[in-house]
Amino acid sequence: MENYDLYLPTHLIFGRGRIDELPSLLPAKGSRILLAMGGGSIRRISLYDKLRELLSDYEVFDFSGIEPNPKISTIRRAVDLCKAQKIDFIVAAGGGSVIDAVKCIAAGAYYDGDPWDLVLDHSRIGRAIPFCAVLTLSATGSDYDNSGVISNSATNEKMFLAASNSGSDLYLHGAGQSDSSRIGGHHLSHIRAVSR
C-alpha cells in the first residue's frame, strides 16, 4: 500500500430542497452569471426553470451544449462569452462533463491565450472565475476535486486538466439533483462549496 495525504476542504450542503440556498452562496445581486449546462437534461427535469428563478436577481447568460468528454472547441466559445460579457460567477448545472468543462472555462476566462494551453501545461493556470455546480448525476467525482478531462477533436487527444494553481479563489461546487442515479428521480438537491 502506498502512503498518501488527502485534503478536501469541502463544505457539503446536502438535502431535499437545499437548492433554495443557492442565492446565499452567490456574489452580490446584479452580478453577471454564466449558466453552463449540457444537452438538455436540466430542462427535462425542470431544473433549468428552478435555477432561472433562483438567479432572477442576477444578469444571467446561458451557455448550453457542453458534451460528454467536453471539447476544447466548446470551451473556447464559453471562454469568449465570459470575456465578452465580463462574467463574475459561473453556475454549472449537469453532470461531471459540465463540471470538467467549467473548470477549464473558469481558468480560461483569465488566460490570454488558448484554453488548450492550460490543459497541456497546468502551471499556466492562475486566477479563475468562482463557480458552483448543481449536479444532476453522480458519476465521475468531478464535483469533489480540482481536475477534469478535456477532449481536443483536432488533435484526437483526451487530456487531464488540474486546476491546483488557482490561488485563493473560492470555488463553489454542487452535487446531486436527484435521489437516484437516474435523472428524473425524486429531486434531492445538494450544493457543495470548495475553497482553494
Question: Which residue ranges define each predicted feature?
Answer:
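Structural signal for hydrophobic packing residues in well-ordered secondary-structure cores
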Residues: 26, 30, 55, 82, ...
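ATP/NTP phosphate-donor binding region
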Residues: 1-89
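Short Gly/Thr/Asp-enriched flexible loops that form oxyanion-binding sites at enzyme active sites
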Residues: 78-79, 98-112, 144-145
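A glycine/threonine-rich phosphate-anchoring loop and its flanking beta-alpha core
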Residues: 20, 111-196
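Fold-independent oxyanion-binding glycine-rich loops
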Residues: 10, 16-17, 37-39, 66, ...
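N-terminal loops that bind phosphate or other acidic moieties
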Residues: 84, 105, 122
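Glycine/serine-rich anion-binding loops at beta->alpha junctions
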Residues: 87-105, 136-142
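Alpha-helix N-cap/helix-start motif
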Residues: 44-45, 101-102, 142-143, 176
